[in-house]
C-alpha cells in the first residue's frame, strides 16, 4: 500500500473519483504508515477508528454522487486546532486531557468537504518555537538526514509535526498555523510547500491563540497545487471570528500553472543579510533566474524597516501571548495542581503546566506591557509594525510580489540551538515581516544544500492576492523540479 501514501493530494482525489481505490483503502495505507513512523513523533494523537469511520462515510457519499471537494482524503491536523471530542493540547501539559466540545471553523470546513482525520500533529508548545523542541510531548524528528550523517534534525517549528508528516508521507496534507514563520520555515526544512494566507483569510475560531493579531492558519502539502486545493477548503468568512474577512474564496488551484509572463517580482535588498550562507544566496539567484526565464520582470526594492522586524515581533507576540495565556489557570479545563489557596493553585498549575519557552515569553510579554515599559517597548513596536506595513505598500506600487529565501539555513540538529533563544529566534528573520504586515507568504522547495538537505524560496504577495503566489509558486516548482525525498530510516 506504500504507493497510495506517495500520491499527491490531487492524484489521490483523481484516483478516488475514478474508483481506482476507495477512501478506506487510502486511509488504511496512511494509518499503517503513521504507525510505522512513530520514531518521528509527528502525531501526538492517532485517531484510526474515527479515520476509518470518516473514510467509510466518504465512500458512501461518493457512491451516492455527493462527493465534496476533499472527499475521502486523509489529512493530519495540527494540535492547535480544536477538534470536537478529540484531545487538543497545543502540545502543552497544561491542556493534557482537554477534549473540546466544539470544532474549529477550519477543521469543520475540511470535514464539510469530505476530508478524513488521521490524528493530531505535534508542534511547539502553544506554537512558540522554531524547532519543535518545546513540545511537552517531545521533539518531532525531521525525516531528512544529512548525507552521510545520522544526527536527528529539526523539522522546524512551530508546525514541525505537520511538516514532518507531509514530508514522510504520513498524510496527504496537513493544517498548520503561522504567527512568525511557523508554516513557511518548517516547509523549507522538510522540502514541502506551505502557505500562510492573508490575515483574516482563514477563521481563527477554535484555534488556540498565541498572538491574535499575527496568528493565521494555512496548509502544508507536497505540491503547490495540493496547497491550493487545501487552502480553498480551509478559507471562508466566519462571523464567529471578528478578524475574518468577508470576501469570496477563489478556486486557488485555478491559478496554478497560469502564465507569469509580465509579472513584476521584487527583490528586497535588505534581505541580503550579513552572514547569509552562500548556498542560500545561490539558491535565491537561481530563483530569480527561473522567474526571469518564465517571463517575469525582476525589480530591486527596498524595505528599510526590515532590520527592526524581529525585535518588534518578539515584543508584540509575547505581549499578546501573556494576555491570551492568562486563561490557563486550572479552574475550568486542563491541568490543575492544588495549592493552599486560590492564588497558590494558579501558581502551582502554571509552574507545572507551562514549559520553559512559554514561561519565557509570558515573562517578556508581561514586562513589555508593564507600567513604565509599555511606551518604551510595546507602543514603539506597534509603530515599527506600521512602518513595516508601509514599506510593503510602497513596494506594491512597483511590483506584484516579492521573492526571498525562506530561512537563513537548512535544518539544523535537534539540541543545536536550544540553549540560545536569540539564535533560535533568528530563524524567523525572513518570515516575521509578512505576519506583521498581515500579508500572504509561501515557501516552495527549490533545491538542496551541500549535505542534501532541502532549501526553500519564499514568495510574498499583496493582501488577498494568494492567486499570484500560486502562479509564481508553480512556476518555481516546475523550474526547480524538486523530486528529492528523504531516505527512509524510520
From Swiss-Prot:
Gene Ontology BP terms: translation
E.C. no: 6.3.5.7
Known catalytic reactions: L-glutamyl-tRNA(Gln) + L-glutamine + ATP + H2O = L-glutaminyl-tRNA(Gln) + L-glutamate + ADP + phosphate + H(+)
Main enzyme class: ligase
GO cellular component, as recorded: glutamyl-tRNA(Gln) amidotransferase complex
Statement: the UniProt record of this protein carries the keyword Ion transport: no
Record bears the keyword Chloroplast: no
Keywords per UniProt: ATP-binding, Ligase, Nucleotide-binding, Protein biosynthesis
Active site: 78 (charge relay system), 158 (charge relay system), 182 (acyl-ester intermediate)
Gene3D superfamilies in the record: Amidase signature (AS) domain (3.90.1300.10)
InterPro entries registered for this protein in UniProt: Amidase (IPR000120), Amidase_CS (IPR020556), Amidase_dom (IPR023631), AS_sf (IPR036928), GatA (IPR004412)
GO MF term (any one): glutaminyl-tRNA synthase (glutamine-hydrolyzing) activity
Record text on subunit structure and interactions: Heterotrimer of A, B and C subunits.
Function: Allows the formation of correctly charged Gln-tRNA(Gln) through the transamidation of misacylated Glu-tRNA(Gln) in organisms which lack glutaminyl-tRNA synthetase. The reaction takes place in the presence of glutamine and ATP through an activated gamma-phospho-Glu-tRNA(Gln).
Family to which this protein belongs: Belongs to the amidase family. GatA subfamily.
Record protein name field: Glutamyl-tRNA(Gln) amidotransferase subunit A
Organism expressing this protein natively: Phenylobacterium zucineum (strain HLK1)
Gene: gatA
